[in-house]
């Protein structure tokens, strides 16, 4: 079966610095896949290379079998991929509902607001609150909701639980798990190992810009030497 998202031989640079070396990965429809690794290993660069924020100098990226490598990020977004940046990137001067409506303006298809609010009841309660008045967890929920309202085939999450209280992390893990159970495909980068392994069915370990290991999430739990070697845990 053809993968929903497939990358082969990605090589990406920042200036003259070679960051990714022949990175290949596959994500099937309705799958949750995680990229693990130390800080600076190349995980976020992998997401940005898939999304077109960073243009790979070599390699292939296919979304449902259609080549998208080299396209601008807005074109890749229209094709069905959304990236939620670590910085969240919401409009602080707009309220929650305005943020959502603005995100859906240029979408080829979009979710109705009530569907979004059904997944994120906190956002419905705060729908008239400005982005700057939201907590960090609420801002992250809004960032994810802004991506989902565009009805993406796959959503890329860059450090979605970073800096959030444990209670909010558990709530976001539950929400992401429900999205996955309903068929949403997710590729995430995250340092919170417990949260990641609670969500992902499969993981890639990125080390110094290379794919060092790929396998089921349960295997990572059962092989502490992998955690020690590549994550320092």
Feature roles, as predicted:
Residues 2-233:
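Glycine-rich phosphate-binding loops of nucleotide-dependent enzymes
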């Amino acid at each position: 079966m053809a993968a929903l998202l497939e990358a082969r031989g990605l090589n990406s640079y920042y200036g003259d610095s070679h960051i990714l070396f022949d990175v290949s990965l596959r994500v099937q429809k309705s799958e949750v896949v995680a990229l693990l690794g130390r800080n600076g290993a190349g995980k976020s660069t992998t997401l940005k290379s898939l999304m077109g924020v960073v243009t790979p100098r070599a390699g292939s990226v296919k979304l449902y079998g259609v080549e998208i490598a080299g396209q601008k990020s807005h074109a890749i977004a229209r094709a069905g991929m959304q990236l939620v940046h670590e910085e969240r990137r919401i409009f602080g001067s707009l309220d929650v509902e305005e943020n959502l409506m603005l995100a859906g303006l240029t979408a080829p298809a979009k979710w109705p607001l009530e569907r979004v609010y059904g997944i994120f009841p906190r956002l419905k309660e705060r729908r008239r609150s400005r982005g700057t008045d939201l907590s960090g967890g609420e801002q992250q929920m809004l960032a994810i909701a802004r991506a989902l309202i565009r009805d993406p085939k796959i959503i890329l999450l860059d450090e979605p639980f970073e800096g959030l209280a444990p209670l909010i992390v558990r709530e976001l893990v539950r929400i992401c798990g429900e999205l996955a159970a309903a068929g949403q495909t997710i590729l995430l980068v995250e340092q919170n190992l417990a949260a990641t392994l609670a969500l992902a069915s499969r993981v890639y370990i990125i080390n110094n810009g290379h794919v060092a290991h790929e396998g089921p999430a349960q295997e990572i739990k059962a092989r502490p030497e992998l955690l020690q070697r590549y994550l320092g845990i």
